[in-house]
């Protein structure tokens, strides 16, 4: 079971990675007639884990109605994330550690955040540390418009930090 591919910012723009993952998990369980209580673990790959769901697999599993005692973890290996989750599940089943594992991937490229640059985060930090009205005013007045230029999370996350190539 999978969701269809679509361009970022279009059909699924209102769906978070955890929501997309939970929909697929729920549909898989419904189609297969597997009781959720039998699922030992959920392993999902996700390139850009949402900040509000750091372990997106766990959140998706719970949103899909799996019991709280179901183990879940997220794999983050850029383009290999989903494949790694499947091979990890396979290994656990083959070694007898688990009997039923749900594995796959989830992603919402639309919802990868824009990030404040170093100038802006430094300004926020100084503002939080300012104790007097004068210190706060001095910090605010040091603001420059270029501080608002964001770092595009999806571009940053999909570029190799060593060689700069797009992954």
Language-model features, listed with the residues they occupy:
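Short polar catalytic/cofactor-binding loops
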Residues: 1-4
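Short glycine-rich phosphate-binding loop at a beta-alpha junction
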Residues: 38-45
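Glycine-rich phosphate-binding loops at beta-strand->alpha-helix junctions
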Residues: 46-52
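Acyl-thioester C-C bond-transforming condensing/cleaving domain
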Residues: 7-36, 53-54, 61-167
């Amino acid at each position: 079971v999978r969701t269809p591919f679509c361009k970022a910012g279009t059909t699924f723009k209102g769906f978070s990675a955890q929501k997309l993952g939970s929909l697929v998990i729920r549909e898989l369980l419904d189609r297969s007639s597997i009781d959720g209580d039998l699922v030992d673990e959920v392993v999902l790959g996700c390139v850009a884990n949402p900040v509000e769901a750091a372990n997106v697999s766990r959140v998706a599993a719970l949103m899909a109605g799996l019991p709280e005692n179901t183990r879940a973890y997220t794999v983050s290996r850029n383009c290999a994330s989903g494949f790694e989750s499947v091979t990890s599940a396979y290994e656990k089943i083959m070694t007898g550690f688990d009997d039923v594992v749900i594995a796959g991937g989830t992603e919402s490229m639309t919802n990868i955040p824009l990030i404040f640059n170093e100038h802006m985060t430094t300004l926020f930090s100084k503002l939080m540390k300012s104790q007097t009205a004068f210190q706060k005013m001095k910090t605010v007045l040091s603001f420059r418009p270029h501080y608002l230029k964001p770092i595009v999370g999806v571009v940053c996350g999909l570029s190799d930090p060593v060689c700069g190539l797009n992954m």
